[in-house]
C-alpha cells in the first residue's frame, strides 16, 4: 500500500458525516478555490549539462516523476471529501491515475510553449530530443498533439484544476471495495465526482458563452481525457520496458506505483502467470 497515502483515520463516529456536509456546503466557486489552494509546487530537477543519452534522459524523467508523486498524494488529500473515502479506495484511485495526472500537468505547463514539453522549469525538452530514447518519440508526439488541442480550446486554469481532479476521481474502472469494507464508499466517490463536475460546469458558464457553446465546450474537454488516458497507457508500457531492459533503475514511490500497475495487470489477465512485479 502507498506508504505516503496518509495514516490519519477518522476521529469520532460523526466525523465523516460532518465532512460530507461540509462538501455539500461548498459552492462550485468555493470548491474551485479549494482545488487552487491544493495545487502542488513546481518541482525542479536540474537538467544535465552534457547532451542527453537514453540513460540520462530516463534518469531525469524518473527522478522528476518520483518527486511529483509525493506532491500528488498531498494534492489528492486536500481535495474536499477525498480522505473520507476508505484508505483502500484512496490508494486504488492514485495507483490508477498517477501517470495521467503527471501527463495532464505536463500538458498544462506546456500549453503556452508550442513544440516544447515543460517537464519542469529547468527541464524543457524539444520533440526531437526524444530521439535518444527508444520508443519515447511516439509518446512525445501524443503529448504534444493533446497539448495542442488544449491550446486550441484555450483551456483556462480553473478548467484544468477541475479536469485534473476528475481524472483522479474517475480513474478506477473496477469496483473499489466490497460491501464488507465500506458500504457507502461508491456513493461518497460518486458524490465527490459530481461536485467536481458541477464545478467545471460552473467555470464554463462563467465564461459568458451561450448555453449551446457551454455544452460543446464541456464535451470537447471531456473527450480529450481519453487521449490523456491513451498517452498514459503508452507511457506506462514504455517505463516498464525501460526498467526491464535495465536502462534506468526505478526506486521509492515510483517503483511502488509501477509494481501496483503490474499486479493489477496480472489479476485482470488470463495469462497472469506470465506477470511478475518489478523487483
From Swiss-Prot:
Subcellular location: Nucleus
UniProt keyword list: Activator, DNA-binding, Lipid-binding, Metal-binding, Nucleus, Receptor, Steroid-binding, Transcription, Transcription regulation, Zinc, Zinc-finger
Domain NR LBD: 27-261
Keyword Protein transport tagged: no
Single GO MF annotation: zinc ion binding
An example Gene Ontology biological process: regulation of transcription by RNA polymerase II
One GO CC term on file: chromatin
Organism superkingdom: Eukaryota
Matches recorded under SMART domains: HOLI (SM00430)
InterPro entries given in the database record: NHR-like_dom_sf, Nucl_hrmn_rcpt_lig-bd, Nuclear_hormone_rcpt_NR3, Nuclear_hrmn_rcpt
Entry comment, domain topic: Composed of three domains: a modulating N-terminal domain, a DNA-binding domain and a C-terminal ligand-binding domain.
Subunit-structure text: Binds DNA as a homodimer. Can form a heterodimer with ESR1. Interacts with NCOA1, NCOA3, NCOA5 and NCOA6 coactivators, leading to a strong increase of transcription of target genes. Interacts with UBE1C and AKAP13. Interacts with DNTTIP2. Interacts with CCDC62 in the presence of estradiol/E2; this interaction seems to enhance the transcription of target genes. Interacts with DNAAF4. Interacts with PRMT2. Interacts with CCAR2 (via N-terminus) in a ligand-independent manner. Interacts with RBM39, in the presence of estradiol (E2). Interacts with STUB1/CHIP.
Job description of the protein: Nuclear hormone receptor. Binds estrogens with an affinity similar to that of ESR1/ER-alpha, and activates expression of reporter genes containing estrogen response elements (ERE) in an estrogen-dependent manner.
Family from the record: Belongs to the nuclear hormone receptor family. NR3 subfamily.
UniProt-recorded name of the protein: Estrogen receptor beta
Source taxonomy: Eukaryota, Metazoa, Chordata, Craniata, Vertebrata
